[in-house]
Amino acid sequence: MIEVRNIHYSVGPLKLIENVSFDVQPGELLAIIGANGAGKSTLLKLLCKEIAPTEGKIYLREQPIETYKLDVLAKFRAVLAQINTLSVSFKVHELVMMGRYPHFVNKPGEEDVQIVKTVMEETGITGFANRDYNTLSGGEQQRVQLARVIAQIYGQPKGLLFLDEPTNGLDLLYQQQILSLARGLANRGYCVVSILHDINFASRYADKVMILKKGKRIAFGVPREVVTSENIHEAFNIQVRLFHDEEFKCPLVIPSMALSEQTTIK
């Protein structure tokens, strides 16, 4: 469980996060959306203990985040960063095993080896287990990185997974694969928090959506309550039309005018 209570974060006079509160329960996927500069990445850094709030409290599994030592935190909290480039070569299975490093001292045990095998099967990367990571496509690399962070918290009761724009730069197929895996983890009891740029993906896959604007929470709740034309206009300064998908029971967003109708390009 994640509990955020009235957090603020400032750098000098600049207020990056202002009075944000929310909860994420085990089994929920929270999507954080907002325009560029809204404070999404800053908020995620606060949740990951990369930076500390200026004011307010963050609780992970009912314990103040500042009381956790990093080695303890690493056993049940995993983070998929936005950029995952490697300057050295690793086999895919070696990289996934890195997710188990917090759980052993010298060498992996049988449980670690089995977890890596299971996670690679679940994420569909077994076929290139012995490939050099740097020879993979962007979508394949992202699946490997997701497998690594899943392996890190695999089997941990109420594990926490933070994803920073996991679909960035991927084609439609890989975007759906990544978010389907994230959705599956939430269904198994994990708390999943993801920054997303695609409002429709947020609406389709998330249990809850939070919209940020200039570091402030302007909406939080289930997609059908949060993904409204009014909220989208306030956050992104664009007029949209909403359609309700009968199969998935979620709103879908389409810009109400083409770019050529809204903006004159010279």
PLM feature spans:
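Conserved structural motif at the start of ABC-family nucleotide-binding domains
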Residues: 2-4, 17-18
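Helix-to-loop junction immediately C-terminal to a conserved catalytic motif
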Residues: 48
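Catalytic Walker B motif of ABC-type/P-loop ATPase nucleotide-binding domains
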Residues: 161-165
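Conserved ABC ATPase "signature" region
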Residues: 111-128, 150
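ABC ATPase nucleotide-binding domains
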Residues: 235-266
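Conserved ABC transporter NBD signature motif
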Residues: 56-64
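Conserved ABC ATPase signature
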Residues: 132-136, 140
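The feature captures the beta-strand-to-loop junction immediately N-terminal to the Walker
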Residues: 33-35
